[in-house]
From Swiss-Prot:
Coiled coil: none
InterPro entries: Chaperonin_GroES, Chaperonin_GroES_sf, Chaprnonin_Cpn10_CS, GroES-like_sf
Gene (UniProt): groES
Protein name as catalogued: Co-chaperonin GroES
Oligomeric form and interacting partners: Heptamer of 7 subunits arranged in a ring. Interacts with the chaperonin GroEL.
Lineage: superkingdom: Bacteria
Amino acid sequence: MKIRPLHDRVVVRRMEEERTTAGGIVIPDSATEKPTRGEIIAVGPGKVLENGDVRALAVKVGDVVLFGKYSGTEVKISGQELVVMREDDIMGVIEK
């Protein structure tokens, strides 16, 4: 199954955070928070403006983004846990 987001929504796959500290200490699953960065796997066509025009999104498939831990709605599709959120929920794109 595939998801196609509408309007200014994007679908993000969370990226795993580092589970060891700089000193080599392993952090258990129970002590880690949900990752707040992920890779965009699908984008909607854009935001519909008041005059009816559609403004394209500033992000694209493959971008690694930073978002708030309470952003979007979690969904499970084809065994993958994904987050559907508005472009406004994205704080920034992490550049390589």
